[in-house]
Structures are given as structure tokens and as C-alpha cells.
């Protein structure tokens, strides 16, 4: 958060945008959408060794309580409408993190008739995390990239 100035009486001046974006980055509540083996690495990121909670993230079971969806694994044609429905139930502002080669572009099953070649064909994706499966460190790096993207956006002031 950029602080523009500190006055004599202990007041801090900054913009409203930077305060709102700081609060958003410190309280991302992801909803897990684990479809395959990448979901296991997502569970590792939530466990004690990597502790995704230190970034202010709290896994939520309901789309109405979350603002980040982590799509982890192979997205089949039959599951695509459910993914879109869950995405539409999330409140604004909402972000999507695509985790793994299968979610990014179909992965190993790219040429299968039943696989969607990337979840970005169904929902808009903000951050792509590569790997098969990506490690928990890669997921944490993707979360940090998303936080930096949120800090760069204008919430109130339009450019």
C-alpha cells in the first residue's frame, strides 16, 4: 500500500483505491474447484508446510462466500456448465486462477473428444499456473501474482 504522506499529528494520507485494494489482497477467500490430481497439490498448499492462510486466504465451501475460484484439473464437457454456474454465483469482484496443464489447455487429454481445451473457454481466467501437477510453491506464486494484479487495478478512480 502506497502511503503518500505522514503528517505531524500521526495522520497518514493515502488514496481510497490503495486501501480498498490492500484489503482485497489480504482477504482472498478461494473456492476450490478440484477436478483431478492438481487438487491434491492445492490441499498441500493449505496444509501446515505451505500454509496459504498466512496470505489471508480461507477456503470456502460456497461460491456465494468466495471471491476467488481455483480451477485445478481436467475440465470435461459435462462439467463445463457446472463450472460456469458456480462462477456466476460468485459475488463481484471475482477472480479465477487456472491451476495445471489440464485446466490451462487440456493438458495430456488435449485431443480427447470430451475435454475442454482450457477453462478460459468457459470463464475468464486471471492467472495461469503451469505444471503437471504444479507444486504448492507454484500455486503460492500464482496467488502472489494475483495479489499484485489486484493492487494495480483501479477500484474507485477510473483512468
Curated annotation (Swiss-Prot):
Location in the cell: Cell inner membrane
GO molecular function: 4 iron, 4 sulfur cluster binding; iron ion binding; NADH dehydrogenase (ubiquinone) activity; NADH:ubiquinone reductase (non-electrogenic) activity; quinone binding
Subunit structure of this chain's protein: NDH-1 is composed of 14 different subunits. Subunits NuoB, C, D, E, F, and G constitute the peripheral sector of the complex.
Pfam families: Oxidored_q6 (PF01058)
Stored InterPro entries: NADH_UbQ_OxRdtase-like_20kDa, NADH_UQ_OxRdtase_20Kd_su
Binding, [4Fe-4S] cluster: 37-38, 102, 132
Biological processes per GO annotation: aerobic respiration; electron transport coupled proton transport
GO CC annotation terms, alphabetical: plasma membrane; respiratory chain complex I
Reactions listed under catalytic activity: a quinone + NADH + 5 H(+)(in) = a quinol + NAD(+) + 4 H(+)(out)
UniProt name for this protein: NADH-quinone oxidoreductase subunit B
Cofactor: [4Fe-4S] cluster
Cofactor, how bound (note): Binds 1 [4Fe-4S] cluster.
EC number: 7.1.1.-
Cysteine-cysteine disulfides: none
Topological type in the membrane: Peripheral membrane protein
Alphabetically ordered keywords of this record: 4Fe-4S, Cell inner membrane, Cell membrane, Iron, Iron-sulfur, Membrane, Metal-binding, NAD, Quinone, Translocase, Transport, Ubiquinone
PANTHER family: NADH DEHYDROGENASE, NADH DEHYDROGENASE [UBIQUINONE] IRON-SULFUR PROTEIN 7, MITOCHONDRIAL
Keyword DNA damage in record: no
Family listed: Belongs to the complex I 20 kDa subunit family.
HAMAP family named among the record's database cross-references: NDH1_NuoB (MF_01356)
Keyword Iron-sulfur listed: yes
